Amino acid sequence: AFCCPSGWSAYDQ
């Protein structure tokens, strides 16, 4: 799934 750094929007954790 897609994840992102702190502050970003989580797509699919």
From Swiss-Prot:
TM segment ranges: none
Tissue occurrence: Expressed by the venom gland.
C-type lectin domain segment(s): 11-13
One GO molecular-function entry: carbohydrate binding
Keyword check for Zinc: no
Top-level taxon of the source organism: Eukaryota
This protein's UniProt keywords: Blood coagulation cascade activating toxin, Calcium, Disulfide bond, Glycoprotein, Hemostasis impairing toxin, Lectin, Metal-binding, Secreted, Toxin
Annotated localization: Secreted
Subunit structure of this chain's protein: Heterotrimer; disulfide-linked. The heterotrimer consists of 1 heavy chain (a metalloproteinase) and 2 light chains: LC1 and LC2.
Additional remarks: Calcium is required for ligand binding.
Descriptive protein name: Snaclec coagulation factor X-activating enzyme light chain 2
Organism expressing this protein natively: Vipera aspis aspis (Aspic viper)
